[in-house]
UniProtKB/Swiss-Prot annotation:
Glycosylated residue positions: 60, 93
Pfam family, one: Noggin
Keyword list, A-Z: Chondrogenesis, Developmental protein, Differentiation, Disulfide bond, Glycoprotein, Secreted, Signal
Upper lineage: Eukaryota, Metazoa, Chordata, Craniata, Vertebrata
Subcellular location: Secreted
Gene Ontology biological-process entries: cartilage development; cloaca development; determination of left/right symmetry; dorsal/ventral pattern formation; embryonic viscerocranium morphogenesis; negative regulation of BMP signaling pathway; negative regulation of cell differentiation; osteoblast differentiation
Name of this chain's protein: Noggin-3
Length: 223
Protein backbone atom coordinates (compact mmCIF):
# COMPACT_ATOMS: atom_id res chain seq x y z
CA UNK A 1 0.00 0.00 0.00
CA UNK A 2 1.38 3.39 -1.01
CA UNK A 3 1.91 6.05 1.60
CA UNK A 4 -1.16 8.14 2.36
CA UNK A 5 -0.64 11.83 1.53
CA UNK A 6 -0.24 14.17 4.46
CA UNK A 7 -3.69 15.68 4.11
CA UNK A 8 -5.25 12.22 4.44
CA UNK A 9 -3.43 11.69 7.70
CA UNK A 10 -4.70 15.09 8.82
CA UNK A 11 -8.21 14.04 7.85
CA UNK A 12 -7.80 10.91 9.92
CA UNK A 13 -6.61 12.80 12.98
CA UNK A 14 -9.46 15.30 12.78
CA UNK A 15 -11.94 12.50 12.28
CA UNK A 16 -10.65 10.57 15.26
CA UNK A 17 -10.57 13.73 17.29
CA UNK A 18 -14.35 13.58 17.65
CA UNK A 19 -14.03 10.18 19.31
CA UNK A 20 -10.75 10.39 21.21
CA UNK A 21 -9.63 13.01 23.68
CA UNK A 22 -5.87 13.44 23.55
CA UNK A 23 -4.06 12.56 26.76
CA UNK A 24 -6.85 10.39 28.19
CA UNK A 25 -5.79 6.82 27.64
CA UNK A 26 -9.12 5.23 28.43
CA UNK A 27 -10.55 6.71 25.22
CA UNK A 28 -8.04 4.77 23.14
CA UNK A 29 -9.91 1.54 23.87
CA UNK A 30 -11.75 2.05 20.58
CA UNK A 31 -8.52 1.26 18.73
CA UNK A 32 -6.94 -1.59 20.68
CA UNK A 33 -7.79 -3.87 23.62
CA UNK A 34 -5.78 -3.39 26.79
CA UNK A 35 -4.05 -6.37 28.44
CA UNK A 36 -5.25 -7.24 31.93
CA UNK A 37 -1.75 -7.71 33.26
CA UNK A 38 1.89 -7.18 32.35
CA UNK A 39 4.43 -9.77 31.33
CA UNK A 40 7.03 -10.48 34.03
CA UNK A 41 10.64 -10.09 32.98
CA UNK A 42 12.85 -13.07 33.64
CA UNK A 43 16.01 -12.19 35.56
CA UNK A 44 18.56 -14.97 35.79
CA UNK A 45 20.52 -15.04 39.05
CA UNK A 46 23.33 -17.57 39.05
CA UNK A 47 26.04 -18.43 41.55
CA UNK A 48 29.28 -17.43 39.78
CA UNK A 49 31.22 -20.35 41.28
CA UNK A 50 32.69 -22.24 38.25
CA UNK A 51 32.42 -25.51 40.20
CA UNK A 52 28.70 -25.34 39.45
CA UNK A 53 29.27 -25.13 35.67
CA UNK A 54 28.72 -28.18 33.45
CA UNK A 55 31.89 -29.91 32.29
CA UNK A 56 32.68 -30.79 28.69
CA UNK A 57 31.48 -34.36 29.27
CA UNK A 58 28.10 -32.97 30.36
CA UNK A 59 27.58 -31.18 27.03
CA UNK A 60 27.12 -34.18 24.75
CA UNK A 61 24.77 -32.87 22.07
CA UNK A 62 23.31 -36.27 21.20
CA UNK A 63 22.39 -37.01 24.81
CA UNK A 64 20.98 -33.54 25.45
CA UNK A 65 18.86 -33.63 22.29
CA UNK A 66 17.48 -36.98 23.44
CA UNK A 67 16.54 -35.49 26.83
CA UNK A 68 14.91 -32.42 25.29
CA UNK A 69 13.17 -34.48 22.61
CA UNK A 70 10.40 -32.76 20.66
CA UNK A 71 10.80 -29.58 22.72
CA UNK A 72 13.84 -28.61 20.64
CA UNK A 73 12.62 -25.85 18.31
CA UNK A 74 15.32 -25.06 15.78
CA UNK A 75 13.71 -21.77 14.72
CA UNK A 76 14.01 -20.42 18.26
CA UNK A 77 16.98 -22.33 19.66
CA UNK A 78 20.65 -22.57 18.77
CA UNK A 79 23.54 -24.53 20.23
CA UNK A 80 26.15 -22.25 18.65
CA UNK A 81 26.25 -18.41 18.54
CA UNK A 82 23.82 -17.34 15.77
CA UNK A 83 25.26 -15.23 12.96
CA UNK A 84 22.49 -12.63 13.32
CA UNK A 85 22.58 -12.51 17.12
CA UNK A 86 22.85 -8.70 17.10
CA UNK A 87 19.85 -8.20 14.83
CA UNK A 88 17.04 -6.83 16.94
CA UNK A 89 15.01 -3.81 17.93
CA UNK A 90 17.89 -1.32 17.86
CA UNK A 91 18.46 -1.98 14.16
CA UNK A 92 14.78 -1.94 13.17
CA UNK A 93 13.94 1.41 11.57
CA UNK A 94 10.58 2.89 10.74
CA UNK A 95 10.53 1.74 7.10
CA UNK A 96 11.35 -1.84 8.11
CA UNK A 97 8.60 -1.71 10.73
CA UNK A 98 6.01 -0.65 8.16
CA UNK A 99 6.99 -3.62 5.97
CA UNK A 100 5.76 -5.94 8.73
CA UNK A 101 2.14 -5.51 7.76
CA UNK A 102 -0.58 -6.99 9.93
CA UNK A 103 -2.36 -10.01 8.51
CA UNK A 104 -5.51 -11.88 9.25
CA UNK A 105 -8.86 -10.24 9.97
CA UNK A 106 -8.94 -6.47 10.44
CA UNK A 107 -9.99 -5.52 14.01
CA UNK A 108 -13.70 -4.77 14.12
CA UNK A 109 -13.06 -1.42 15.84
CA UNK A 110 -11.08 -0.22 12.81
CA UNK A 111 -13.32 -1.87 10.21
CA UNK A 112 -16.38 -0.09 11.62
CA UNK A 113 -14.67 3.30 11.81
CA UNK A 114 -16.10 6.16 9.77
CA UNK A 115 -14.17 9.22 8.56
CA UNK A 116 -15.20 12.79 7.81
CA UNK A 117 -13.17 14.85 5.35
CA UNK A 118 -12.58 18.31 6.80
CA UNK A 119 -11.68 19.97 3.48
CA UNK A 120 -14.12 22.70 2.62
CA UNK A 121 -17.59 21.29 2.99
CA UNK A 122 -17.80 18.30 5.31
CA UNK A 123 -18.50 15.04 3.46
CA UNK A 124 -17.83 11.32 3.63
CA UNK A 125 -14.83 9.81 1.81
CA UNK A 126 -15.25 7.33 -1.03
CA UNK A 127 -15.20 3.60 -0.28
CA UNK A 128 -11.69 3.34 -1.73
CA UNK A 129 -10.37 6.21 0.39
CA UNK A 130 -12.11 4.86 3.49
CA UNK A 131 -10.48 1.47 2.91
CA UNK A 132 -7.05 3.09 2.50
CA UNK A 133 -7.49 5.04 5.72
CA UNK A 134 -8.53 1.90 7.59
CA UNK A 135 -5.51 -0.02 6.26
CA UNK A 136 -3.20 2.86 7.18
CA UNK A 137 -4.61 2.99 10.71
CA UNK A 138 -4.37 -0.79 11.06
CA UNK A 139 -0.74 -0.71 9.94
CA UNK A 140 0.11 2.26 12.18
CA UNK A 141 -1.35 0.67 15.31
CA UNK A 142 0.15 -2.74 14.53
CA UNK A 143 2.69 -3.91 17.12
CA UNK A 144 5.14 -6.48 15.75
CA UNK A 145 7.20 -8.80 17.92
CA UNK A 146 10.88 -7.94 17.37
CA UNK A 147 13.09 -11.00 17.77
CA UNK A 148 16.70 -11.14 18.88
CA UNK A 149 19.01 -13.91 20.08
CA UNK A 150 19.78 -14.08 23.79
CA UNK A 151 22.69 -15.90 25.40
CA UNK A 152 21.44 -17.67 28.54
CA UNK A 153 24.89 -18.82 29.59
CA UNK A 154 26.53 -22.24 29.78
CA UNK A 155 24.14 -23.54 32.43
CA UNK A 156 21.31 -23.68 29.91
CA UNK A 157 20.95 -25.90 26.86
CA UNK A 158 20.45 -24.90 24.16
CA UNK A 159 22.40 -21.85 25.24
CA UNK A 160 20.91 -19.42 22.72
CA UNK A 161 17.20 -18.57 22.49
CA UNK A 162 15.39 -16.27 20.11
CA UNK A 163 13.30 -14.03 22.37
CA UNK A 164 10.81 -11.31 21.54
CA UNK A 165 10.38 -7.68 22.51
CA UNK A 166 7.86 -5.01 21.56
CA UNK A 167 8.79 -2.16 19.22
CA UNK A 168 8.65 1.04 21.28
CA UNK A 169 10.43 3.77 19.31
CA UNK A 170 7.16 5.59 18.67
CA UNK A 171 3.60 5.70 19.89
CA UNK A 172 1.20 3.26 18.23
CA UNK A 173 -1.94 5.40 18.56
CA UNK A 174 -3.56 8.45 16.97
CA UNK A 175 -3.33 10.83 18.82
CA UNK A 176 -0.05 9.72 20.44
CA UNK A 177 -0.01 8.27 23.94
CA UNK A 178 -0.26 4.50 23.71
CA UNK A 179 2.71 2.15 23.34
CA UNK A 180 3.33 -1.45 22.27
CA UNK A 181 3.31 -3.82 25.25
CA UNK A 182 3.26 -7.62 25.65
CA UNK A 183 -0.17 -8.93 26.73
CA UNK A 184 0.93 -12.54 27.03
CA UNK A 185 3.82 -14.93 26.65
CA UNK A 186 4.48 -18.45 25.49
CA UNK A 187 7.10 -20.86 26.81
CA UNK A 188 10.11 -22.63 25.40
CA UNK A 189 11.33 -25.76 27.17
CA UNK A 190 15.10 -25.83 27.69
CA UNK A 191 17.50 -27.75 29.93
CA UNK A 192 19.04 -26.17 33.01
CA UNK A 193 22.14 -27.44 34.79
CA UNK A 194 21.17 -27.79 38.46
CA UNK A 195 23.52 -28.70 41.30
CA UNK A 196 22.42 -29.78 44.79
CA UNK A 197 24.65 -30.49 47.79
CA UNK A 198 24.07 -34.03 49.09
CA UNK A 199 25.73 -36.13 51.78
CA UNK A 200 27.89 -37.79 49.19
CA UNK A 201 28.92 -34.47 47.67
CA UNK A 202 27.68 -32.20 44.91
CA UNK A 203 25.11 -33.82 42.62
CA UNK A 204 24.39 -32.13 39.28
CA UNK A 205 22.03 -32.95 36.43
CA UNK A 206 20.18 -31.38 33.51
CA UNK A 207 16.53 -30.70 34.28
CA UNK A 208 13.82 -29.36 31.91
CA UNK A 209 12.53 -25.86 32.67
CA UNK A 210 10.12 -23.53 30.91
CA UNK A 211 11.48 -20.18 29.78
CA UNK A 212 8.83 -17.49 29.03
CA UNK A 213 9.16 -15.48 25.82
CA UNK A 214 7.00 -12.69 24.43
CA UNK A 215 4.71 -14.06 21.73
CA UNK A 216 2.45 -11.07 21.05
CA UNK A 217 2.51 -7.28 21.34
CA UNK A 218 -0.50 -4.96 21.49
CA UNK A 219 -1.08 -1.23 21.52
CA UNK A 220 -2.03 -0.27 25.08
CA UNK A 221 -1.72 2.35 27.80
CA UNK A 222 1.83 2.94 29.10
CA UNK A 223 0.86 2.34 32.76
Amino acid sequence: MDNIPYFLATVLIFSLGFRIEEGMCQHYYLLRPIPSDSLPIVELKEDPDPVLDPKERDLNETELRAILGSHFEQNFMSINPPEDKHAGQDELNESELMKQRPNGIMPKEIKAMEFDIQHGKKHKPSKKLRRRLQLWLWSYTFCPVVHTWQDLGNRFWPRYLKVGSCYNKRSCSVPEGMVCKPPKSSHLTVLRWRCVQRKGGLKCAWIPVQYPVISECKCSCPN
